[in-house]
Amino acid sequence: MTATLMDGRTLSRQLLESTAERVTGFHRSHGRRPCLATVLVGEDPASHTYVRIKVNRCTEVGIDSRRFDLPTLTTTEQLVRVLRDLSSDSAVDGILLQHPTPPQIDEHAAFEAIDPSKDVDGVTGTSFAAMAFGYRGFASCTPAAIMRLLDAYDVPLSGQRAVVVGRSAILGKPIGMLLLARDATVTYCHSRTTDLAAHVAEADLVVAAVGVPHLVRGEWIKPGAVVVDAGYNAGNVGDVQAATAANRASLITPVPGGVGPMTIAVLLAQTVDAAERHG
């Protein structure tokens, strides 16, 4: 068996095109364009690259973008003040705090300074609760991107056994909740899990989201399973040993070109959602 690649690039392009059409309609109706404010603290090269890509995608679809670059030694209090100011700015529809932030920053406090109505990255407690209880809100972008990929490839979820490797607040935990809402049977695995291989071997769907290169070995994958690799590590490799996993899985996301492009497209789509709610 050779797995079919889940093409995040093509799907993201389709979502960006539909988002651009929505931006045009919003501009026609409201006389302004949706606006995304991006806040970046420090000089991390990867973070600067990610922000540049997001700003470029905003330009492509017609979303106004504001970029705020803060010094590496910015304090939590200073960052919170910036985020609160943006939250109260009626011209801003969405706010993205690029993470990870420098170690002196209390990231939780920073996230909670974002108005939930502008939390288009889905990082506040309010957004997390909305995902858990099925309320209207903004899903964390990478989990939402994964769900779109699964739906695009008609992956059945109800009654299926899903194993999520990773328990971060913005990826592992929320993707598990979204899968649970679709009636999957979800198991979380993490650094303290014993016999990870046995858990993975029972999964119909594996979501790897732990940030450890090739942690999930290809021979662990159940024949015919679906594998979503949300990891992105040095050397352009994911959390899954892709070469061997592809010989057992039915569907697998490539790294790069799978989850990443869809995540950015979801961010922009949710920015337009926020603008439409703000009016």
UniProtKB/Swiss-Prot annotation:
EC number per UniProt: 1.5.1.5, 3.5.4.9
Residues that bind NADP(+): G166, R167, S168, S191
Transmembrane annotation, as ranges: none
Gene Ontology MF: a single term: methylenetetrahydrofolate dehydrogenase (NADP+) activity
GO biological process, one term: L-histidine biosynthetic process
GO annotation, cellular component aspect: cytosol
Disulphide bridges: none
Metabolic or biological pathway, per its Swiss-Prot or TrEMBL entry: One-carbon metabolism; tetrahydrofolate interconversion
Catalysed conversion reaction: (6R)-5,10-methylene-5,6,7,8-tetrahydrofolate + NADP(+) = (6R)-5,10-methenyltetrahydrofolate + NADPH; (6R)-5,10-methenyltetrahydrofolate + H2O = (6R)-10-formyltetrahydrofolate + H(+)
Keyword terms, alphabetized: Amino-acid biosynthesis, Histidine biosynthesis, Hydrolase, Methionine biosynthesis, Multifunctional enzyme, NADP, One-carbon metabolism, Oxidoreductase, Purine biosynthesis
Cross-referenced InterPro entries: Aminoacid_DH-like_N_sf, NAD(P)-bd_dom_sf, THF_DH/CycHdrlase, THF_DH/CycHdrlase_cat_dom, THF_DH/CycHdrlase_CS, THF_DH/CycHdrlase_NAD-bd_dom
Family per record: Belongs to the tetrahydrofolate dehydrogenase/cyclohydrolase family.
Function: Catalyzes the oxidation of 5,10-methylenetetrahydrofolate to 5,10-methenyltetrahydrofolate and then the hydrolysis of 5,10-methenyltetrahydrofolate to 10-formyltetrahydrofolate.
Subunit structure: Homodimer.
PANTHER family: C-1-TETRAHYDROFOLATE SYNTHASE, CYTOPLASMIC, C-1-TETRAHYDROFOLATE SYNTHASE, CYTOPLASMIC-RELATED
Name the UniProt record assigns to this protein: Bifunctional protein FolD 1
Source species: Salinispora arenicola (strain CNS-205)
UniProt lineage: Bacteria, Bacillati, Actinomycetota, Actinomycetes, Micromonosporales
